[in-house]
Amino acid sequence: MHNIIKSTLSMSPVIPVLTIDKVKNVEYLFEALICGNLKVVEITLRTSCALKVIEIASKKFSSLKVGAGTVISDKDLNSVKDAGATFAVSPGFTLPLATHAIEIDFPYLPGISNSSDIMNLTNLGYKFFKFFPAQASGGIEYLKSLNGPFPEIMFCPTGGINQENASKWLSQKNVICVGGSWIIPAQMNDYKEIQKRALYASRLAS
């Protein structure tokens, strides 16, 4: 389970975080991301069609690793697994949810914002975390400070990350990738622009 998270997060320097409110033409979004060489996506459970979008992405785009975001309960976790998601992501965590992910052997990236969160989750075997909200929780300087007591822990900072500052985040030795919504802002349907942004993002760590 944890090895799958590691290999998945290593596939793309930037994970687009998408909140999609309609199913129509959603395939074009994923095609644009793939053409832009981004292979991992997070689809948040913030809309009524999110599970359907996850199902479409999982079934039609075998080269894409489909993450489900805003997973906050056992029910959510079971639902995204059934929909075909590759992994689940939370803005925070609860010990019951983190334990349930282990019990059903489903790759899970819990959200953390402080040392106590990390200590609770490492006791369960977790080593990869979503640092959220990254900018509001202390930014790069705080993330740097976590490397001292937790040298084996890796993070996917999300929240306040954009095209201008993503490279600086990615240069930190305890950052495996970053998450961001700037690649596909809400209501954007310019697929050439999405592909262009995705291609730029895919090269940030090179």
PLM features: residue spans?
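Conserved N-terminal beta1-alpha1 strand-loop-helix module at the mouth
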Residues: 1-86, 103, 163-164, 171, ...
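Glycine-rich beta-to-alpha transition loops that act as phosphate-gripper elements at the mouths
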Residues: 19-21, 68-74, 90-93, 110-115, ...
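Short hydrophobic/aromatic-enriched beta-strand-loop microsegments
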Residues: 65-68, 86-92, 107-111, 127-133, ...
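Short, charged, surface-exposed secondary-structure boundary motifs
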Residues: 78, 97-102, 119-124, 139-142, ...
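Glycine-rich phosphate-binding active-site loops on the catalytic face of alpha/beta enzymes
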Residues: 87, 91-97, 130-139, 173-197
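Histidine/lysine/aspartate-rich catalytic loop segments that bind and position anionic ligands
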Residues: 94-127, 132-137
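Shared catalytic-loop signature of beta/alpha-barrel
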Residues: 141-162
